[in-house]
């Protein structure tokens, strides 16, 4: 069983890397200027455009929600909103990659500056919701896998293979058994300029 899970985990990890590496090789943009100083929201939007499944499904279907029940009357207590959803299907494996775009400085990476318990718990909750609703999203199978990811911006302009994502590490809740794939949130750094260039190229088409 452990070997089987390890093979599934490796397969999905490779799929995630393939997704993150889907840059074009003929980018020619030198500089891109956005009309906002609030780059955190720009970063989140570009990640969603680059990796999200636009037009394939209603993203709101992936929003977990809660209800109050008072005197036999129920009322909506609000929703949680994942940044980006990406479905995948290959051979007998089906699943979903849930991406949270975090605008943190790559040079200052340590366990104190990375996403906190609040963000980690939200990602795990998103994973639980998608896992429970897998049949609604067409990804239900004995091998359904849900993959959780944090993406942060970086500047790799002075390094080789600048378009390759850099694996940072992962977060877990140590008190939990973490048997489900979505209970481990992997963190990658993405070259910011490459993402901006790729986003701009898509917008010009």
Per-range role (PLM):
Residues 26-205:
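Catalytic core segments in nucleotide and nucleic-acid processing enzymes
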Residues 1-41:
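Interdomain/boundary linker segments immediately adjacent to catalytic/signaling cores
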């Amino acid at each position: 069983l452990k070997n089987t899970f390890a093979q599934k985990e490796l397969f999905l990890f490779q799929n995630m890397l393939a997704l993150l590496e889907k840059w074009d090789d003929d980018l020619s943009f030198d500089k891109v200027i956005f009309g906002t100083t609030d780059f955190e929201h720009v970063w989140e939007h570009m990640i969603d455009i680059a990796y999200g499944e636009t037009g394939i499904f209603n993203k709101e279907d992936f929003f977990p929600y809660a209800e109050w029940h008072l005197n036999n009357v129920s009322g909506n207590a609000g929703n949680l909103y994942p940044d980006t959803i990406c479905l995948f299907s290959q051979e007998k494996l089906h699943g979903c990659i849930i991406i949270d775009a975090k605008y943190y400085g790559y040079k200052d990476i340590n366990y104190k500056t990375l996403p906190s318990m609040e963000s980690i718990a939200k990602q795990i909750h998103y994973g639980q919701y998608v896992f429970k609703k897998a049949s609604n999203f067409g990804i239900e199978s004995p091998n359904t896998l849900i993959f959780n990811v944090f993406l942060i911006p970086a500047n790799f302009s002075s390094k080789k293979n600048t378009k390759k994502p850099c694996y940072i590490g992962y977060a877990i809740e140590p008190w939990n058994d973490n048997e489900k794939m979505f209970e481990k949130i992997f963190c990658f750094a993405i070259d910011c300029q490459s993402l901006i260039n790729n986003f701009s190229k898509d917008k010009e088409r």
